[in-house]
Amino acid sequence: MAQVAIITASDSGIGKECALLLAQQGFDIGITWHSDEEGAKDTAREVVSHGVRAEIVQLDLGNLPEGALALEKLIQRLGRIDVLVNNAGAMTKAPFLDMAFDEWRKIFTVDVDGAFLCSQIAARQMVKQGQGGRIINITSVHEHTPLPDASAYTAAKHALGGLTKAMALELVRHKILVNAVAPGAIATPMNGMDDSDVKPDAEPSIPLRRFGATHEIASLVVWLCSEGANYTTGQSLIVDGGFMLANPQFNPE
């Protein structure tokens, strides 16, 4: 029986690229979408072209806990789960002094509560299967350093990083490995870009002087799902073109 990977928010961007690269590795793929059903269907068509199975379902992590139950439907349809990639997320920007509490809670509901519930559903099934598994949380460089005027997003990503470590420690006894991937400035629809925007010298403030491509995140996710990562758990792997190394003394010239 084929292994199964479920990637949340895989209708576009990093999630879609994770789905396609894992399909190339022979995984059957569970695809979720929030508002772009056609994007999810496009992902499914590309996944199936690699000779594996694809199932799609709408996932609304703004409506919890009920919304997360869609993950159970995917697991039932696919028969099992071996990998969960928590890619769904939300963000908003506002100065700390102006941040409304309901906006703060919306970000935490999707980015932290949603990942918690999806991980719990997946991990319980993995324990039941008795063969271990992998859970990968897509965080952000802002898990490690603040984004100005985005206190809710920054705090939520820090919380998801902490949850990653707590899950890793508790689930290792079940051979479930839990890690995070922390992207920097990646050319995704959330950032108003796509991979065509990955051009040399497009972003001089980043030491590599460009935005990242979605496959540069997804390829690390694939590695974390491989035997090569059998000794890796509780880590947050930063992929940022050197962004975290830059400081006021950094001269892009």
From Swiss-Prot:
InterPro entries: NAD(P)-bd_dom_sf, Sc_DH/Rdtase_CS, SDR, SDR_fam. GO terms for molecular function: oxidoreductase activity. Keywords: Oxidoreductase. The active site is at Y153 (proton acceptor). Substrate binds at S140. One of its GO terms (biological process) is monocarboxylic acid metabolic process. It comes from the Bacteria. Transmembrane segments: none annotated. SUPFAM superfamilies: NAD(P)-binding Rossmann-fold domains. NADP(+) binds at residues 6-30. Its EC number is 1.-.-.-. PROSITE patterns: ADH_SHORT (PS00061). Pfam families: adh_short_C2 (PF13561). Belongs to the short-chain dehydrogenases/reductases (SDR) family. This is Uncharacterized oxidoreductase YohF. It comes from Escherichia coli (strain K12).
